[in-house]
């Protein structure tokens, strides 16, 4: 694993650096394999990043978009990660509908939806059960409790090591999420983290030793490249 940590002066610089990295990796992937695969994160931090991507002139037919996690709500619900990404980016560009690989959330059974999304991924990547295909980029955020995707502290989702997708849980509300072994299979994992409220969690995530189950972002140790992009408010006290 190659680990890089960058602290940017403010959120504007954070988004600009994130955009630059993604565009570089997109260009390389399309040149090498004819397509680019990316898993998106939710939350408020990446919205301006998605808006910036939408402003680019890109080969949209070669870009495939997935979600690292999704709240178990309808796609038009205000809390939907899919809706946020569509509003900020996907509905603004000429990307083929079949290139948007949204999480199914209308089965009234999160386990069924998780299995459907896993099957979809296996079909797309032509991977067998038990194999962990590699996305080009998995984009992640981190909460002030050190959760990432919908992998929350001391939850059952952290115990799942033989699946691509599982059911996460936040305050009794189910979510669909990548498992940490699937995230770790990615060619590049990019954390984009902003805000002073993240400092205590970051200190534990970067500590030489800590309780991984209490700070789930510690589980993210990809086979490929790990990039932490932080704004100054988040990274000011970090010793890296």
From Swiss-Prot:
Species annotation: Nostoc sp. (strain PCC 7120 / SAG 25.82 / UTEX 2576)
Enzyme class, broadest EC rank: hydrolase
Protein family per UniProt: Belongs to the glucosamine/galactosamine-6-phosphate isomerase family. 6-phosphogluconolactonase subfamily.
Pathway recorded for this protein: Carbohydrate degradation; pentose phosphate pathway; D-ribulose 5-phosphate from D-glucose 6-phosphate (oxidative stage): step 2/3
Reactions catalysed: 6-phospho-D-glucono-1,5-lactone + H2O = 6-phospho-D-gluconate + H(+)
Keywords: Heterocyst, Hydrolase
The protein, known as: 6-phosphogluconolactonase
Enzyme Commission numbers on file: 3.1.1.31
A GO molecular-function descriptor: 6-phosphogluconolactonase activity
Biological process (GO), any one: heterocyst development
Any Pfam family: Glucosamine_iso
Coiled coil: none
PANTHER family linked to this entry: 6-PHOSPHOGLUCONOLACTONASE
Chain's role: Hydrolysis of 6-phosphogluconolactone to 6-phosphogluconate.
InterPro entries the record matches: 6-phosphogluconolactonase_DevB, Glc/Gal-6P_isomerase, NagB/RpiA_transferase-like, PGLS
Origin: domain of life: Bacteria
């Amino acid at each position: 694993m190659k680990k890089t940590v960058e602290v940017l002066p403010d959120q504007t610089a954070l988004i600009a650096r994130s955009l630059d990295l993604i565009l570089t990796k997109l260009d390389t992937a399309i040149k090498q394999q004819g397509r680019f695969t990316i898993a998106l994160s939710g939350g408020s931090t990446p919205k301006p990043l998605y808006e910036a991507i939408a402003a680019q002139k890109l080969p949209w037919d070669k870009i495939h978009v997935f979600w690292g996690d999704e709240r178990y709500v309808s796609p038009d619900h205000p809390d939907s990660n899919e809706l946020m990404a569509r509003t900020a980016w996907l509905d603004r560009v000429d990307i083929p509908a079949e290139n948007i690989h949204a999480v199914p959330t209308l089965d009234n059974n999160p386990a069924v939806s998780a299995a459907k999304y896993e099957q979809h991924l296996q079909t797309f990547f032509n991977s067998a059960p038990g194999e962990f295909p590699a996305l080009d980029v998995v984009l992640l955020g981190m909460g002030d409790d050190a959760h990432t995707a919908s992998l929350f502290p001391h939850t059952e989702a952290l115990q799942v090591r033989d699946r691509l997708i599982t059911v996460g849980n936040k305050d009794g509300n189910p979510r669909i999420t990548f498992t940490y072994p699937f995230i770790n299979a990615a060619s590049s994992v990019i954390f984009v983290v902003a805000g002073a409220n993240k400092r205590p969690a970051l200190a534990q995530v970067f500590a030489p030793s800590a309780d991984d189950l209490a700070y789930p972002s510690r589980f993210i140790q990809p086979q490929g490249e790990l990039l932490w992009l932080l704004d100054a408010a988040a990274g000011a006290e970090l010793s890296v």
